[in-house]
């Protein structure tokens, strides 16, 4: 009887974990019609970038400013170029997935001094920014 209870408890725990995992996956999935703001930090000689500060301080600061308009954000660390011998073109790329681009621009405009002052704390790179509308999401069904 105890073995049966333990087995049922294990099944319940696995079910709970898979539900939470599925919910988290949905939270981190962009949607068609959303906007992706890409902040690219070019890799140039003499430039500095503090990835730890970027991850632990700057991006959470930005997420707080963007509020509910931000669905989620991503951080990429550049590790290579097109070929193994190519220098990495960007040391980092940050992505904000937002529902409303007008609201994004409004928040950034209202907080530009805070954002620029924080930028100086982790890099001397002038970022390149691109805002895109997500037009299509498609899984690769090829196996």
Residue spans for each PLM region:
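Bacterial Sec-dependent N-terminal signal peptides
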Residues: 1-27
């Amino acid at each position: 009887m105890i073995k049966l209870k333990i087995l049922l408890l294990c099944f319940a725990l696995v079910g709970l974990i898979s539900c939470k995992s599925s919910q988290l996956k949905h939270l981190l999935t962009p949607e068609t019609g959303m906007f992706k703001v890409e902040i690219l930090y070019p890799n140039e000689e003499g430039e500095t970038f503090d990835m730890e500060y970027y991850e632990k301080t700057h991006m959470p600061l930005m997420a707080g400013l963007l509020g509910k308009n931000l669905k989620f954000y991503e951080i990429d660390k550049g590790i290579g170029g097109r070929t193994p011998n190519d220098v990495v073109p960007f040391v980092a790329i940050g992505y904000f997935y937002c529902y409303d681009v007008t609201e994004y621009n409004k928040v950034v405009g209202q907080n530009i001094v805070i954002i620029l002052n924080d930028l100086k704390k982790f890099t001397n790179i002038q970022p390149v920014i691109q805002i895109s509308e997500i037009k299509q999401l498609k899984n690769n069904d090829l196996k």
